[in-house]
């Protein structure tokens, strides 16, 4: 991997705005370096201090880190606490019960505000109801529910009684849901009659019934149904229960179950490169510490902020920066049921103005799709809305290409809001490498520097450090509290996937090709290792080619994959969405040549795509991620055999397959 070629030559740099720097928790690079040096000097002492300052413990911990069974690390093991107590009770006890915890905006625009006192009461009622159905400490509860206050309540209620939740995104198929219910050994399922997104309904209860009928789900004795739309559902008496009926007569008080620091808070499934999905298991204390700390550092959270993370609670971003991080610090946050393009592509910008959002966190895919819409229709351009409340904006989920970064900075951040381009993963629990809004000069396309206490590095295939400016593999050299503890039921897979013997067995393998800038040391993520192309012996990250394509004035979005080639070993195949209508015939051929030459000029002849296909869109999941594995099959001319249940736009596959 040391031969990966970094072809990003971004030199634009943006200093933190003076007003943000002056008021920031970490103000200036000297403050950042002081924290990083504290962690290097006394690693365990650094984390112990944060854990004592950030969390409220029922029983204080004595031992900080146990490395005796590496890589199955344990943090604060002899301490006891409760995540729900730290997210709710302590704020109410501090006199913040009337502070708004959640501003919920439904798909149709209806707005509901829930205070911390209200949320605590709702969580307690549901926790009591679950206990009466026999759910308790150590049980696993699968949650298959729309974006809703009820989803947050269900997660927090599980944490309150010591049950471990496993949230399944509301767009997954019955087969995918079944796999997760069986793998995790769930005893209860929480779902809804239907989901509302973009003016359309999805029958979640019917899908859940199909999953449970596939066999192997006998342990599921309770199915709780949240009535979202009032749609008709099949009913299994004795097993199924309406959420509103279940909690109607329950007490508003529920004593938290005090659990050990290492108690599994949740299991979240993430795709593996091969085989079945991996159930990533997270601890209670280490995870909660880090999502709270990164709210304070990355987002520079202040008590008067209105925070909005646009993710779904079915993904780790929604766990960390909706259900747990904001509530752990006592934040007011927006939670949104819908999609950014309904009823039009100005929805995000309108909501920022309506709710006076100060910190906004979304995905590059959403930004790119909204760029295309804004450039086609000024009515949905950010400049048509009041975004004056914003002070910090962020990105999550994938690297953001420099052109999209600049557009976001100029049009959404109005050239006055720092962008926190955050790199992290399901397995890391929270942010790992990111600018700090009041400290780090930002560079478009770079996630800049690791947070204090995160010992990230770039190494070759043998685990040896590579010089700055030379590409390699991103690793983390020391354990951190929020890291995943294991893969549920498969510790060997955990070791092989994340701590491979080829790297010595002690380095956390992130799986991303990365390069550090020669001068600044900034990290730039170049794409997954399996998204690295080997063309004529030259290794190129897909992000660089995509960035070059998107920098062309006609291109809105691009995704690049490889396919075997007899001459070059691997050929570059690009799928491109234009800012105008899709070309065909001779026009398409001429434009493909133009873009090939453009990439050759931007990067070099070696990176020229051999095949460019134009589509009206790219195949994406309902959470907005590009489904690159499908593009690889299309590029090779193979039939699509993979699970497409999470695909938002199935018709696009036929369109892209037709184009040659």
Swiss-Prot record:
A single cellular component GO annotation: cytosol
Top-level enzyme category: ligase
N6-acetyllysine PTM positions: 625
Binding of Mg(2+), residues: 550, 552, 555
Keywords: Acetylation, ATP-binding, Ligase, Magnesium, Metal-binding, Nucleotide-binding
Cross-referenced Pfam families: ACAS_N, AMP-binding, AMP-binding_C
CDD domains assigned: ACS
Catalytic activity: acetate + ATP + CoA = acetyl-CoA + AMP + diphosphate
Molecular function terms from GO: acetate-CoA ligase activity; AMP binding; ATP binding; metal ion binding
Lineage top rank: taxon: Bacteria
Chain residues that bind ATP: 397-399, 421-426, 512, 528, 539
Required cofactor(s): Mg(2+)
Residues that coordinate or bind CoA: 197-200, 317, 536
SUPFAM superfamilies: Acetyl-CoA synthetase-like (SSF56801)
Post-translational modifications reported in the UniProt record: Acetylated. Deacetylation by the SIR2-homolog deacetylase activates the enzyme.
EC number: 6.2.1.1
InterPro entries: Ac_CoA_lig, ACAS_N, AMP-bd_C, AMP-bd_C_sf, AMP-binding_CS, AMP-dep_synth/lig_dom, ANL_N_sf
Record-linked PROSITE patterns: AMP_BINDING (PS00455)
Function: Catalyzes the conversion of acetate into acetyl-CoA (AcCoA), an essential intermediate at the junction of anabolic and catabolic pathways. AcsA undergoes a two-step reaction. In the first half reaction, AcsA combines acetate with ATP to form acetyl-adenylate (AcAMP) intermediate. In the second half reaction, it can then transfer the acetyl group from AcAMP to the sulfhydryl group of CoA, forming the product AcCoA.
Name the UniProt record assigns to this protein: Acetyl-coenzyme A synthetase
Organism: Burkholderia mallei (strain ATCC 23344)
Species lineage: Bacteria, Pseudomonadati, Pseudomonadota, Betaproteobacteria, Burkholderiales
Gene label: acsA
């Amino acid at each position: 991997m040391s031969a990966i070629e970094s072809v990003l030559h971004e030199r634009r740099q943006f200093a933190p705005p003076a007003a943000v720097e002056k008021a920031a928790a970490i103000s200036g690079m000297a403050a950042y370096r002081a924290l990083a040096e504290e962690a290097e000097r006394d690693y365990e002492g650094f984390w112990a201090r944060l854990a004592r300052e950030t969390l409220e413990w029922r029983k204080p911990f004595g031992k900080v880190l146990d490395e005796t069974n590496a890589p199955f690390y344990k943090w604060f093991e002899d301490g006891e606490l409760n995540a729900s107590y730290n997210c709710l009770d302590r704020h109410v006890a501090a006199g913040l019960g009337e502070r708004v915890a959640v501003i919920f905006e439904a798909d149709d625009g209806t707005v509901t505000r829930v205070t911390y006192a209200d949320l605590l009461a709702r969580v307690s009622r549901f926790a009591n109801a679950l206990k009466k159905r026999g759910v308790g400490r150590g049980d696993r509860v699968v949650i298959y529910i729309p974006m809703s206050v009820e989803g947050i309540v269900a997660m927090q209620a599980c944490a309150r009684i010591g049950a471990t939740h496993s949230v399944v995104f509301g767009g997954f198929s019955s087969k995918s849901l079944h796999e997760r219910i069986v793998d995790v050994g769930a005893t209860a399922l929480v779902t809804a009659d239907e989901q509302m997104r973009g003016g359309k309904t999805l029958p979640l209860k019917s899908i859940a019934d199909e999953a449970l009928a596939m066999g192997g789900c006998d342990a599921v004795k309770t199915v709780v149904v949240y009535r979202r739309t009032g749609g008709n559902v099949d009913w299994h008496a004795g097993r199924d229960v309406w959420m509103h009926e279940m909690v109607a007569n329950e007490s508003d008080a529920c004593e938290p179950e005090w659990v050990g620091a290492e108690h599994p808070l949740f299991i979240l499934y993430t795709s593996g490169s091969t085989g079945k999905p991996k159930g990533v298991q997270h601890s209670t204390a280490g995870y909660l510490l880090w999502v709270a700390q990164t709210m304070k550092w990355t987002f520079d959270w202040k008590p008067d902020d209105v925070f909005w993370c646009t993710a779904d609670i079915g993904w780790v971003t929604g766990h960390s920066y909706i259900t747990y991080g904001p509530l752990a610090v006592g934040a007011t946050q927006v939670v949104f049921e819908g999609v950014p393009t309904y009823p039009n592509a100005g929805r995000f910008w309108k909501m920022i103005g309506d709710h006076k959002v100060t910190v906004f966190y979304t995905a590059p895919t959403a930004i790119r799709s909204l760029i295309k819409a804004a450039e086609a229709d000024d009515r949905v351009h950010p400049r048509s809305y009041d975004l004056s409340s914003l002070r910090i904006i962020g990105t999550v989920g994938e690297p953001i290409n420099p052109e999209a970064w600049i557009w976001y900075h100029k049009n959404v951040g109005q050239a006055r809001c720092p962008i926190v381009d955050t790199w992290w993963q399901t397995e890391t629990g929270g942010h790992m490498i990111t600018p700090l809004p009041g400290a780090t000069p930002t560079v478009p396309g770079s996630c800049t520097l690791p947070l204090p206490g995160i010992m990230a590095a770039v190494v070759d295939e043998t685990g040896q450090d590579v010089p700055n400016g030379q590409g390699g593999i991103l690793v983390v050299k020391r354990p951190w509290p929020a890291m995943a503890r294991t893969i549920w039921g498969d510790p060997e897979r955990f070791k092989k996937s994340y701590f491979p013997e080829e790297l010595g067995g002690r380095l956390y393998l992130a799986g991303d090709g990365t390069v550090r800038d020669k001068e600044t040391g900034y990290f730039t993520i170049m794409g997954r290792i399996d998204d690295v192309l080997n063309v004529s012996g030259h290794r190129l990250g897909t992000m660089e080619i995509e960035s070059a394509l998107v920098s062309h004035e006609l291109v809105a979005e691009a995704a690049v994959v490889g396919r075997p080639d007899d001459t070059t070993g691997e050929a570059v195949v690009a799928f491109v969405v234009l800012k105008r209508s899709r070309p065909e015939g001779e026009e398409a051929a001429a434009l493909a040549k133009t873009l090939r030459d453009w990439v050759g000029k931007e990067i070099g002849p070696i990176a020229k795509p051999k095949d460019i296909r134009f589509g009206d869109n790219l195949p994406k999941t309902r959470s907005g991620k590009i489904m690159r594995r499908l593009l690889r099959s299309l590029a090779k001319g193979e039939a699509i055999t993979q699970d497409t249940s999470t695909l938002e736009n199935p018709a696009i596959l036929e369109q892209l397959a037709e184009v040659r």
